[in-house]
Amino acid sequence: MHTYLDFEKPIAELEGKVQELKLLAQEDPSVSIGDEVSKLEQKAAQLLQETYASLTPWQKVQVARHPARPHFLDYVERLVEDFTPLAGDRLYGEDSAIVGGLGRFRGRSVMFIGHEKGSDTQGRIKHNFGMARPEGYRKAIRLMTLAERFGIPVVTLADTSGAYPGMESEERSVAEAIARSTDRCLSLGVPLISVVIGEGMSGGAIGIACGNRVLMLEHSIYSVISPEGASSILWRSSDKTKDAATAMKITAQHLHELGVIDRVLPEPVGGAHRERNQMIKETGDAIAEELKGLEKLDADSIRRVRREKFLAMGRIGFS
């Protein structure tokens, strides 16, 4: 059963009517309603296209959080052959909110690292809804260092509402872990491609997303804080989330204009969750293209290009 968002109610009504008519036709073949079904399907498709062509920032937040949106393990399952997960930070323990491992991607060895939110209740609990603890970032550091040692490129997929803010995270220095993970990204001597596939919130996302090339799916979001958090801090109210989402310029389109990201990957009409396999394949194509563009650079050039890219942020309008 498809999950509809609040702003999709008119679409849900039309698609629901189409399903009702199709069931009626199955129950009574003598009923001729083919033309009516076709008209409703066209109307629903047009409404879906018009709706997604003019989404507000807050509506994009809702799409980025859609429960059926493909997650890290969905991408790994369809893009990576012989994936071997690697667990533990070798300091404290294992954190399932960040998953990483080696595999074959389009004929080459690649280290894949990313946030996993989980797709059902059991999975969400296991992966802590994609909110990583310190050991998750320290595991990412370990895997990136391993990839560098063997000259293997790294691909990271960010999808988190933020690092886990619990007491145990603070006791084990989550801020320090994120800072060191960010530094490891910036100093890595192999190509690093980062893709924001859903939510990219705060240091929790940045800690694994400082790539040579940073890509975002069309309806994903990327920001230092969630709209709810910004509303609470700036307006002392939970009623200003829509205003916060607009003011912070958290959409892929805004961030591309500002030079924060390098590329926006178009999503199927209706979002990545409607055509999961298509979205995953096209994301894989983009990753392969970006890796090919970096394969001739030596380690020093890879580091220099990446650092210059991030140091240049914020200079737009000042030169």
Swiss-Prot record:
Gene Ontology BP terms: fatty acid biosynthetic process; malonyl-CoA biosynthetic process
Keyword ATP-binding: yes
Signal peptide limits: none
Transmembrane residue ranges: none
Record keyword DNA damage present: no
Alphabetical keyword list: ATP-binding, Cytoplasm, Fatty acid biosynthesis, Fatty acid metabolism, Lipid biosynthesis, Lipid metabolism, Nucleotide-binding, Transferase
Record-listed E.C. numbers: 2.1.3.15
Subcellular location(s) per record: Cytoplasm
UniProt catalytic activity: N(6)-carboxybiotinyl-L-lysyl-[protein] + acetyl-CoA = N(6)-biotinyl-L-lysyl-[protein] + malonyl-CoA
Segments forming domain CoA carboxyltransferase C-terminal: 39-293
One Pfam entry name: ACCA
Domain of life: Bacteria
Gene3D superfamilies reported for this sequence: 2-enoyl-CoA Hydratase, Chain A, domain 1 (3.90.226.10)
Molecular-function GO terms, alphabetical: acetyl-CoA carboxylase activity; ATP binding; carboxyl- or carbamoyltransferase activity
A single cellular component GO annotation: acetyl-CoA carboxylase complex
Chief localisation class: cytoplasm
Pathway(s) the chain acts in: Lipid metabolism; malonyl-CoA biosynthesis; malonyl-CoA from acetyl-CoA: step 1/1
Assembly and interaction partners: Acetyl-CoA carboxylase is a heterohexamer composed of biotin carboxyl carrier protein (AccB), biotin carboxylase (AccC) and two subunits each of ACCase subunit alpha (AccA) and ACCase subunit beta (AccD).
UniProt record similarity statement: Belongs to the AccA family.
PANTHER family registered for this protein in UniProt: ACETYL-COENZYME A CARBOXYLASE CARBOXYL TRANSFERASE SUBUNIT ALPHA (PTHR42853), ACETYL-COENZYME A CARBOXYLASE CARBOXYL TRANSFERASE SUBUNIT ALPHA, CHLOROPLASTIC (PTHR42853:SF3)
Function per UniProt: Component of the acetyl coenzyme A carboxylase (ACC) complex. First, biotin carboxylase catalyzes the carboxylation of biotin on its carrier protein (BCCP) and then the CO(2) group is transferred by the carboxyltransferase to acetyl-CoA to form malonyl-CoA.
Family matches, as HAMAP family: AcetylCoA_CT_alpha (MF_00823)
Classification via NCBIfam families: accA (TIGR00513), AccA_sub (NF041504), PRK05724.1 (NF004344)
Protein name: Acetyl-coenzyme A carboxylase carboxyl transferase subunit alpha
Species, as recorded: Parvibaculum lavamentivorans (strain DS-1 / DSM 13023 / NCIMB 13966)
Gene name, Swiss-Prot/TrEMBL: accA
